[in-house]
UniProtKB/Swiss-Prot annotation:
This is Immunoglobulin superfamily member 3. Expressed in a wide range of tissues with High expression in Placenta, kidney and lung. The gene is IGSF3. Disulfide bonds join 42-120, 167-246, 302-376, 432-511, 566-645, 701-782, 838-918, 974-1080. Residues 997-1033 are annotated as: Disordered.
Length: 1194
C-alpha cells in the first residue's frame, strides 16, 4: 500500500499520454499466508465514458489454468460462481473503490484454495476497442508457520525491582522472509504500549513512554539462540504494571520492492503487579443537588484517591441514615439489603463500580421517605497467600443530606415570538416554555390558539399528553403542506411555526398548557393549567409598493459603462418575491420592448430583441433588497434610448402556487451615448526636400497625440502639383491596415515604387517613394483619420486632421558629358583604310548609355550628312551618306575600351573626302525604367582627303617603219613601257593617220570608201583645224570588249595580246590603200573602291609608217579575189559530179535486183555511198581536189 498511490498516479499519467485503455494490476507473484487478509489493487486509465468504471475479478486455479472462475464484480451481484458466492455475501470477499478508476480486492480470510492467477477486467465503455481491458497477477498461499509462545504467569513486584520475560518465536516458511519481534504492555481499558521492538531490518525501537529508559539501558531486548527473545526492565515503576506479551510478524518482500507482513502472532501475557511504596488513600462523596421533588432521580458518587488503585483491593459500603444500603467487595459485585434489593430489582435503584476509583449509588425515582443522610465507606483489603482477603484501613467522607418534597403543580407558562410586527410572507415562530418549581411530575398537553381582531378564537394546533400533534380545522390544509408546524423541543418547551404568513394571520397567539400526572391507580389526572399569549401585527406586502428608476450617468461616452438602478420601495427583504423587468426604447423608435427580466425565483430571462445586450450587460439584485441594478458596459449607439423598469410583487401560497399582488412602472430614463472627445494632433511642421532622381523620397506623418491607446489610423497620402487645383490621392491605408492605391498612383505608375511603413512607436507613419522621378516633384502631405472600435465591434471615424506639407523637388543629375575636341587632318590614297576616333572624356553616370553618331561635311555641301550611328543599345546603323557612297560594306566599328569608339572606313574613295566629326548623346534611365536624353556633345573635326594614285603611263614611242608587199600582212605593235598601278587595265585603239590636203589616195576597189572619207573630212573641216585625219582601225576597251572594225580593214584585222603590256594588231591582205601612218592610243583605267573603273590617264604612241607595194592582177588573183567566182569555179562542180555518179550507181543496182526477182529481199547489201572527201587549199592558191578514197563505197 505504500507504493500504491504513486504507482496509481504514474499509471494515470501514462493513460492520458497513451490515449488508450490500459488496465494495470498489482505486480505478482504475491506470497500470503493462510488466514491472512490480503488486498490487491487494480486501476484503469486512458478510457472513454463515465469517470467511475466497473471492475470484475476472476481466478484461474492451478488445477485448471484455462478455466475462468468468477469471484466478485462491482456491477453484478450474481457474478460470483457458487464456490465464492457465500464468502462474497458474507463480506469476506469484497471490492473497495478507492477512486472512480481504482479499486482494491479484499480477501479477509485467505484459504489455500485461493491460490492461482487473478484477473482484473474492466467492461468497455469506449466507443471502440482500443487498448487492454484486463490484467493478471499470481497469488501463492503458503501455510502460516509462525509460532509465538511465552509462559502465562502473574508476577508481583515491588517498585524498583527488576523484571525479565522470555518469548519463543519460530517460523518454517520456505520463502525468504524476515521476522520482527515486539514486547508490549497493556492495561485494562487502555491501548497497548510498545515497550521495545526489533524490526525486520534488525533495528531496535521503543515507544515514547520507554524511549528514554531504553536509551539509558534500563530496558533491553536480547536474542538468546535462534528463537528466544528476552525482555529486561531493570527498575520497575508503578506505571509498568500491566500485562506484558510479545508480538511477532513475518515479513516478505513483494515484487514492487515493498515489505508486507504476511502474519502476526502474539503470545500469552504475563501479568505484572508493581506495588508502590505509598499506601495512603482518601475518600470523598459528591452529588449535584440536595433538594428534590418526588419522582426525581439522584446520584451519589464515592471517589477513591490513591496510588496504584488497579493493583490494590478495596471494598465499598453505602449507608442511608446510618442504615446499610449495599456493600461491594473487590470483585465489584454489589450486595443490597432486602428493602433496597426490591427497588433495585424494579430498576429504581442501582449500585455500581464506574471505574477503579469511582463507585456510584443512583436512585431513579425518589420518594418522600428518601429524605435523609447518605454516606459511603471504603475499606482496603489485602489478599493472603491462601487467596482470602483481610481488612486493613477504612475511611468514609462526610454525610450528604437531601430533602424530597411532595408533588404539586408549580408550572408557569411564557410565550415568546420571533417578532411582534412582521411583513406578510415572513415566518412566525412561537415558543411556549413551561417552568416548574421542581422536577416535572407528569406530562403536558398544549393547545395553540389565535384570537383575531374580532375576538374570534380558533385552534391552530394541539399536542396531547401522549405526544400526538393535530391541526385545527381551519389550519388542516396549510398543515398538510407544511405551512403550520408544532413541535415539542424539550420536555417543557413547545414551539409553533407559521410559515409564509398572510395578512389574516394577524392577531393574539395564545399557548394553553395542561399538566397531567398518573394517579396510584394508573389513571391520568390534571394537576393544573396555565396560558400565555403574545400579539402579532402583519404588514401587507403591497402597502407602499413603488418603483423608481435612477441613473447617475445619463450621458456616457463610447465604451464607457453606465448603471441603471431600479429601486423598490419599501425596502423588502431578499426573500420577498419581486420580479423586475427592464424595458428599452431605442432612439428613433416609439415602442418599448422587454430587455431583461429578473424573475421572482432569481432567474434571468432575456427578451427576444436583447441579443446585442447579453454579452455586455450584467444584472444584479441586491442581497438585502429587491433593488435591481442593470450594468451595461462598452456603451454604444445601440444602447442609447429610454429605459424603464417594471416591478411585480408576488406571494407564494402554502400550496406552492403564486399570486401577483401588485405591479408598478417606474419613470423613464433617457441615456445618451456620445462619441469621445478627440485628442488627435498631427504634426504641422513644413519641410523642403531636394534630391536627385532615382533616390527615395522619405515622407513622414507623425501623430503627436491620440484619443485612445486603442486608436487605429487611416492615413491618406496626397500630392499637390502647381498645375492642379487640389491634391491627388497617392495611397490610402485604412484603419485595418488594408492598402488602397489612389488614382494618381495608378495613372503615374507609382504602385511598384511605393512603400508604406508604420513604426513600432505606433504614431509615426512613413511613405517612401522609391526611385524618384522628376515628375514626382510636388507638395506632399498626409490626411490622418482616427478610428475607434465601437462597443459593437464596428469601427467608426472619430476625427481627421491634415499634416504640414513637404515640398519635394526631384531634379535630374548634372550633366558631365565631355568629348575630346582634338582637330585633325588626314590624307590617304584610295583603297586604304581610315580610322576615325571618338573619345568620351567624362560622362554623367556610369549607368548611362551613349548614342554615338558620325557625320561628314562634303565640299560644296553646307549641310552635314550622317555616316553611321551606334545606338545606345549597341546597334549599328548606316546613315544616308553611307547609302550614297556605298559605304555599307566598308564601315567597321570598334570600342577597345569604355568611352573610346573607332570608326574604320575601308577601301576609301575620293568621294569619301570631307570633314568628319562625332556627336554623342548620353541617355539615363528614369526611375520608371524609361530612358531619356540627359546630355549631348560634339567632338573635334577631322578633315579627310582621299587621293588617287599619280599617273605614270608611258607608251613606247620608238617604233620602226615597215614596207610590205601587196597581199601580205603587217603588224602594228603597241608597247606600254610603264603603268601607274599593277591593278590598272588598258584600253587600246589603233588609228590610221593621213594628211587632209593632198593626202588623197586611191586604191583599187576602194573608191567608195575614199569618197565616204572625203565627205566626212569635209563635214569636219569647220570644227577641226588639225591637218591629220584619224581613222580608227580597231579599239579594245579595258573590259576586253572589241569595238567595230574600220570599214577599209573589216575582216582583215587580227588582235593579239602578247603580254599585259604588249598589244599587237595584224592587218592581213595589205593593199596599196593601206599605205600610211599608224599609231596606238592607250587609256589606263583603275578600279575605284566601289569596284567601278575610271580612266586615270591616256597616252598615244608615235606614228608608224607602213608602205604596201602594188603588183599587177592574175587569173588566180582575180578568182581568189572574188568569192563568188571562187566558189563557182572550184566548189560547185564537184558536188554536182558526185551526185551524178551516185545516181548512175543506184539505177544500176536497182536493175540487177529486178532481174533477180527482188535481190534486195534476199539480203544482198545495197550500195552505200558516203560523202566524198573534198580537199582544198585554204590559201585558195590550188584548186580543190575531189577524191574518193578506198572504202568510201561499200
Amino acid at each position: 500500500m505504500k507504493c500504491f498511490f504513486p504507482v496509481l498516479s504514474c499509471l494515470a499519467v501514462l493513460g492520458v499520454v497513451s490515449a488508450q485503455r490500459q488496465v494495470t494490476v498489482q505486480e505478482g507473484p504475491l506470497y500470503r499466508t493462510e488466514g491472512s487478509h490480503i488486498t490487491i489493487w487494480c486501476n484503469v486509465s486512458g478510457y472513454q465514458g463515465p469517470s467511475e468504471q466497473n471492475f470484475q475479478w476472476s481466478i484461474y486455479l492451478p488445477s485448471s489454468p484455462e478455466r475462468e472462475v468468477q469471484i466478485v464484480s462491482t456491477m453484478d451481484s450474481s457474478f460470483p460462481y457458487a464456490i465464492y458466492t457465500q464468502r462474497v455475501r458474507g463480506g469476506k470477499i469484497f471490492i473497495e473503490r478507492v477512486q472512480g478508476n481504482s479499486t482494491l480486492l479484499h480477501i479477509t480470510d485467505l484459504q489455500a484454495r485461493d491460490a492461482g492467477e487473478y484477473e482484473c477486467h474492466t467492461p468497455s465503455t469506449d466507443k471502440q476497442y482500443f487498448g487492454s481491458y484486463s490484467a493478471k497477477m499470481n497469488l501463492v498461499v503458503i501455510p502460516d508457520s509462525l509460532q509465538t509462545t511465552a509462559m502465562p504467569q502473574t508476577l508481583h513486584r515491588v517498585e524498583q525491582d527488576p523484571l525479565e520475560l522470555t518469548c519463543e518465536v519460530a517460523s518454517e516458511t520456505i520463502q525468504h522472509s524476515h521476522l520482527s519481534v515486539a514486547w508490549l504492555r497493556q492495561k485494562v481499558g487502555e491501548k497497548p504500549v510498545e515497550v521495545i521492538s526489533l524490526s525486520r531490518d534488525f533495528m531496535l525501537h521503543s515507544s515514547s513512554e520507554y524511549a528514554q529508559r531504553q536509551s539509558l539501558g534500563e530496558v533491553r531486548l536480547d536474542k538468546l539462540g535462534r528463537t528466544t527473545f528476552r525482555l529486561t526492565i531493570f527498575h520497575l515503576q508503578p506505571s509498568d504494571q500491566g500485562e506484558f506479551y510479545c508480538e511477532a510478524a513475518e515479513w516478505i518482500q513483494d515484487p514492487d520492492g515493498s515489505w508486507y507482513a504476511m502474519t502476526r502472532k502474539r503470545s500469552e501475557g504475563a501479568v505484572v503487579n508493581v506495588q508502590p511504596t505509598d499506601k495512603e488513600f482518601t475518600v470523598r462523596l459528591e452529588t449535584e443537588k440536595r433538594l428534590h421533588t418526588v419522582g426525581e432521580p439522584v446520584e451519589f458518587r464515592c471517589i477513591l484517591e490513591a496510588q496504584n488503585v488497579p493493583d490494590r483491593y478495596f471494598a465499598v459500603s453505602w449507608a442511608f441514615n446510618s442504615s446499610l444500603i449495599a456493600t461491594m467487595g473487590p470483585n465489584a459485585v454489589p450486595v443490597l439489603n432486602s428493602e433496597f434489593a426490591h427497588r433495585e430489582a424494579r430498576g429504581q435503584l442501582k449500585v455500581a463500580k464506574e471505574s477503579d476509583s469511582v463507585f456510584v449509588l443512583k436512585i431513579y425515582h425518589l420518594r418522600q421517605e428518601d429524605s435523609g443522610k447518605y454516606n459511603c465507606r471504603v475499606t482496603e483489603r489485602e489478599k493472603t497467600v491462601t487467596g482470602e482477603f483481610i481488612d486493613k484501613e477504612s475511611k468514609r467522607p462526610k454525610n450528604i443530606p437531601i430533602i424530597v418534597l411532595p408533588l404539586k403543580s408549580s408550572i408557569s407558562v411564557e410565550v415568546a415570538s420571533n417578532a411582534s410586527v412582521i411583513l406578510e410572507g415572513e415566518d412566525l415562530r412561537f415558543s411556549c416554555s413551561v417552568r416548574t418549581a421542581g422536577r416535572p411530575q407528569g406530562r403536558f398537553s398544549v393547545i395553540w390558539q389565535l384570537v383575531d381582531r374580532q375576538n374570534r378564537r380558533s385552534n391552530i394546533m394541539w399536542l396531547d399528553r401522549d405526544g400526538t400533534v393535530q391541526p385545527g380545522s381551519s389550519y388542516w390544509e396549510r398543515s398538510s403542506f407544511g405551512g403550520v408546524q408544532m413541535e415539542q423541543v424539550q420536555p417543557n418547551s413547545f414551539s409553533l411555526g407559521i410559515f409564509n404568513s398572510r395578512k389574516e394571520d394577524e392577531g393574539q397567539y395564545e399557548c394553553h398548557v395542561t399538566e397531567w400526572v398518573r394517579a396510584v391507580d394508573g389513571e391520568w389526572q390534571i394537576v393544573g393549567e396555565r396560558r400565555a399569549s403574545t400579539p402579532i401585527s402583519i404588514t401587507a406586502l403591497e402597502m407602499g409598493f413603488a418603483v423608481t428608476a435612477i441613473s447617475r450617468t445619463p450621458g456616457v461616452t463610447y465604451s464607457d459603462s453606465f448603471d441603471l438602478q431600479c429601486i423598490i420601495k419599501p425596502h423588502y427583504p431578499a426573500w420577498v418575491p419581486v420580479s423586475v423587468t427592464w424595458r428599452f426604447q431605442p432612439v428613433g423608435t416609439v415602442e418599448f420592448h422587454d430587455l431583461v427580466t429578473f424573475t421572482r425565483d432569481g432567474g434571468v430571462q432575456w427578451g427576444d430583441r436583447s441579443s446585442s445586450f447579453r454579452t455586455r450587460t450584467a444584472i444584479e439584485k441586491a442581497e438585502s433588497s429587491n433593488n435591481v441594478r442593470l450594468s451595461i458596459s462598452r456603451a454604444s449607439d445601440t444602447e442609447a434610448g429610454k429605459y424603464q423598469c417594471v416591478a411585480e410583487l408576488w406571494r407564494k401560497n402554502y400550496n406552492n402556487t403564486w399570486t401577483r399582488l401588485a405591479e408598478r412602472t417606474s419613470n423613464l430614463l433617457e441615456i445618451r451615448v456620445l462619441q469621445p472627445v478627440t485628442k488627435l494632433q498631427v504634426s504641422k511642421s513644413k519641410r523642403t526636400l531636394t534630391l536627385v532622381e532615382n533616390k527615395p523620397i522619405q515622407l513622414n506623418c507623425s501623430v503627436k497625440s491620440q484619443t485612445s491607446q486603442n486608436s487605429h489610423f487611416a492615413v491618406l497620402w496626397y500630392v499637390h502639383k502647381p498645375s492642379d487645383a487640389d491634391g491627388k490621392l497617392i495611397l490610402k491605408t485604412t484603419h485595418n491596415s488594408a492598402f488602397e492605391y489612389g488614382t494618381y498612383a495608378e495613372e503615374e505608375g507609382l504602385r511598384a515604387r511605393l512603400q508604406f511603413e508604420r513604426h513600432v512607436s505606433g504614431g509615426l507613419f512613413s511613405l517612401t517613394v522609391q526611385r524618384a522621378e522628376v515628375s514626382d516633384s510636388g507638395s506632399y502631405y498626409c490626411h490622418v483619420e482616427e478610428w475607434l472600435l465601437s462597443p459593437n465591434y464596428a469601427w467608426y471615424k472619430l476625427a481627421e486632421e491634415v499634416s504640414g506639407r513637404t515640398e519635394v523637388t526631384v531634379k535630374q543629375p548634372d550633366s558631365r558629358l565631355r568629348l575630346s575636341q582634338a582637330q585633325g587632318n588626314l590624307s590617304v590614297l584610295e583603297t586604304r583604310q581610315v580610322q576615325l576616333e571618338c573619345v568620351v572624356l567624362n560622362r554623367t553616370s556610369i549607368t548611362s548609355q551613349l548614342m554615338v553618331e558620325w557625320f561628314v561635311w562634303k565640299p560644296n555641301h553646307p549641310e552635314r550628312e550622317t555616316v553611321a550611328r551606334l545606338s545606345r543599345d549597341a546597334t549599328f546603323h548606316y546613315g544616308e551618306q553611307a547609302a550614297k557612297n556605298n559605304l555599307k560594306g566598308r564601315l567597321h566599328l570598334e570600342s577597345p575600351s569604355p568611352g573610346v569608339y573607332r570608326l574604320f572606313i575601308q577601301n576609301v574613295a575620293v568621294q569619301d573626302s570631307g570633314t568628319y566629326s562625332c556627336h554623342v548623346e548620353e541617355w539615363l534611365p528614369s526611375p520608371s525604367g524609361m530612358w531619356y536624353k540627359r546630355a549631348e556633345d560634339t567632338a573635334g573635326q577631322t578633315a579627310l582627303t582621299v587621293m588617287r594614285p599619280d599617273a605614270s603611263l608611258q607608251v613606247d614611242t620608238v617604233v620602226p617603219n615597215a614596207t610590205v608587199s601587196e597581199k601580205a600582212a603587217f603588224q602594228l605593235d603597241c608597247s606600254i613601257v610603264s603603268r601607274s598601278s599593277q591593278d590598272s587595265r588598258f584600253a587600246v585603239a589603233w588609228y590610221s593617220l593621213r594628211t587632209k590636203a593632198g593626202g588623197k589616195r586611191s586604191s583599187p576597189g576602194l573608191e567608195e570608201q575614199e569618197e565616204e572619207r572625203e565627205e566626212e573630212e569635209e563635214e569636219d573641216d569647220d570644227d577641226d583645224d588639225d591637218p591629220t585625219e584619224r581613222t580608227a582601225l580597231l579599239s579594245v576597251g579595258p573590259d576586253a570588249v572589241f569595238g567595230p572594225e574600220g570599214s577599209p580593214w573589216e575582216g582583215r584585222l587580227r588582235f593579239q595580246r602578247l603580254s599585259p603590256v604588249l598589244y599587237r594588231l595584224t592587218v592581213l591582205q595589205a593593199s596599196p590603200q593601206d599605205t600610211g601612218n599608224y599609231s596606238c592610243h592607250v587609256e589606263e583605267w583603275l578600279p575605284s573602291p566601289q569596284k567601278e573603273w575610271y580612266r586615270l590617264t591616256e597616252e598615244e604612241s608615235a606614228p608608224i609608217g607602213i608602205r604596201v607595194l602594188d603588183t599587177s592582177p592574175t587569173l588566180q588573183s582575180i578568182i581568189c579575189s572574188n568569192d563568188a567566182l571562187f566558189y563557182f569555179v572550184f566548189f560547185y562542180p564537184f558536188p554536182i559530179f558526185g551526185i551524178l555518179i551516185i545516181t548512175i550507181l543506184l539505177v544500176r543496182f536497182k536493175s540487177r535486183n529486178s532481174s533477180k526477182n527482188s535481190d534486195g529481199k534476199n539480203g544482198v547489201p545495197l550500195l552505200w555511198i558516203k560523202e566524198p572527201h573534198l580537199n582544198y587549199s585554204p590559201t585558195c592558191l590550188e584548186p580543190p581536189v575531189l577524191s574518193i578514197h578506198p572504202g568510201a563505197i561499200d
